[in-house]
Regions:
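Hydrophobic residues within the alpha-helices of tandem HEAT/HEAT-like
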Residues: 84, 98-106, 123, 138-149, ...
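Core helices of alpha-solenoid repeat scaffolds
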Residues: 70-80, 112-123, 154-167, 180, ...
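Long, hydrophobic/aromatic-enriched structural stretches that serve as scaffold segments
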Residues: 129-151, 315-316
Length: 492
């Protein structure tokens, strides 16, 4: 069932997709996740390494035939898939890590379509019988498979077959926090890409909401203390929930606003900087969706919310890391600027509406009295209601350059979805933006550009020209930031 798109570009075939946006917020991984990643890297020797092969392919350049490179890559991927059913847990983890790297760096839809059932069975066993590290890697691979297969029948079938397992691990309090974290991210991304039924969307929203809502006080009560090991899980669940909000029907958005907008500000006092930033960006997204739903939307506790945002935007507590304070202040300055301008716009609109009514009433009464005194019919003219040209708060625009193209991230919805794909694809994000039809469709980039080697070489600038461009950009950026720093006190 198609769903309304919250982004700027239309979805091909009438299907729904929202715009995404880049965000610096990432879920806290915790020590267990770091150990899982290091162990997986150390055990990739059980399976052939993809990294060394990729480096050799890159160094080969034009000397190696492109078709031969693709065949070599697929041969190694076949070995990784076979290793998923190995009896050794370390071998399975190494195969999952290698698959994760391959799917993030390459586009392989045809290869995956032929082995979709095999991969689904292997991932199901890893999620069912594996331990924390194996479950976390399996969930990460599942999210990448959904990105590779897209919203077609195979992708939808894959997500539906493994969705119950993701929910089971996510809601299991005894499971590893790292496994639950990756299951939350995979559930949100898989539902966004592959779920076509509104009921699936609502069920995923409810499941994710239940994870982070437990850390919020009910009915204005003080939020319960959350263990440090669960901060990453709460952050991932909140970000996945916000991702699905961008494609949520408007009929459900209004209920979510009433239920969650009073609760989310409690997360702004969390000990985790990532969770605080995720909560702030989600609040800004909710206000953006509320404005799209109803221009006269009013939040009753706006003063307290702006006070909390202003405190975080100017936070200088020394017990927090300097890098965390800088990132937090940057994020919350944008959130505060957006929410504060939204409040000012709502107040101005409400004031204009009220005084127009008062003015109209007074004018009619004055003219009526004058007409009665003169015993002549009066003519009351209706005051003109010219539309307001004042613009409310907007998300700071971010420019993403890849190849010869540019992506503009100009809303909180686009920002959240760009960040979701960036988190799962990592350094392969630019490659997928250039070649993955799903991402190009979501962000409105049009068909894939086909450029030969001659065209690419003609577009490539020299090292000296690049140096001049970087120097000019640095100078302009320094001037712009200096002006912002001078006016920062006025904004806050």
């Amino acid at each position: 069932m198609p769903r309304a798109r919250k982004g700027n570009a239309p979805r091909r075939g009438g299907q729904r997709r929202g715009g995404g946006a880049r965000s610096s917020t990432q879920a806290d991984s915790g020590s267990s996740e770091d150990e899982a990643a290091s162990e997986a890297r150390s055990t990739t020797s059980e399976c052939p390494s993809l990294l060394s092969t990729a480096a050799e392919e890159g160094l080969g350049g034009d000397a190696v035939d492109e078709q031969g490179q693709q065949e070599d890559l697929e041969e190694k991927l076949k070995e990784y898939v076979d290793c998923l059913t190995d009896k050794s847990a370390k071998t399975r983890q190494g195969a999952l890590e290698s698959l994760r790297l391959a799917l993030a760096a390459h586009l392989l839809p045809d290869f995956l379509l032929e082995r979709c059932l095999t991969l689904a069975d292997a991932l199901e066993k890893c999620l069912k019988k594996g331990k924390g590290e194996e479950q976390a890697l399996a969930a990460a691979v599942l999210g990448l498979l959904c990105v590779q297969l897209g919203p077609g029948p195979k992708g939808e079938e894959l997500f539906h077959s493994l969705q119950p397992l993701l929910v089971s691990v996510l809601t299991d309090g005894t499971a590893s926090p790292a496994a639950r974290l990756h299951c939350a991210s995979a559930l949100g991304l898989g539902c966004y890409v592959a779920a076509a039924d509104v009921q699936d969307l609502v069920s995923c929203l409810t499941c994710l909401e239940g994870v982070f809502s437990r850390s919020c006080g009910v009915g204005g009560a003080t939020a319960p203390m959350v263990p440090t090991s669960l901060h990453g899980l709460l952050c991932a669940a909140l970000q996945a929930w916000a991702l699905l909000l961008t494609i949520c029907p408007s009929t459900h958005i209004s209920h979510i606003l009433d239920r969650q907008l009073p609760q989310l500000p409690q997360l702004l006092s969390s000990e985790s900087v990532n969770l605080r930033i995720a909560a702030g960006e989600t609040i800004a997204l909710l206000f953006e969706l509320a404005r799209d739903l109803e221009e006269d939307f009013i939040y009753e506790d706006m003063e307290a919310l702006c006070g909390a945002l202003r405190t975080l935007a100017t936070d200088s507590n020394k017990y927090r890391a300097k890098a965390d304070r800088r990132r937090q202040r940057s994020t919350f300055r944008s959130v505060l600027h957006f929410v504060d301008k939204y409040r000012a716009k709502a107040d101005r609109r409400r004031q204009r509406s009220t005084f127009r009514s008062v003015l109209h009433f007074v004018e009619v009464r004055v003219r009526l009295d004058a007409s009665l005194q003169e015993c002549a019919p009066g003519t009351a003219t209706k005051p003109s209601h010219s539309p307001s040209t004042l613009q409310g708060g907007e998300c700071e625009e971010e420019t993403v350059r890849f190849g010869l193209e540019v992506l503009y991230v100009d809303s909180w919805a686009r920002r959240r979805i760009y960040a979701a794909f960036k988190d799962v694809l990592g350094s392969g994000m630019h490659h997928h933006l250039q070649n993955n039809e799903l991402l190009r469709d979501i962000f409105g980039l049009g068909p894939v550009l086909v450029l030969d080697a001659t065209a690419l070489k003609a577009c490539k600038i020299s090292r000296f020209e690049k140096h001049l461009y970087n120097a000019a950009s640095f100078k302009a950026r320094t001037k712009a930031r200096s002006r912002v720093r001078d006016k920062r006190a006025d904004i806050l």
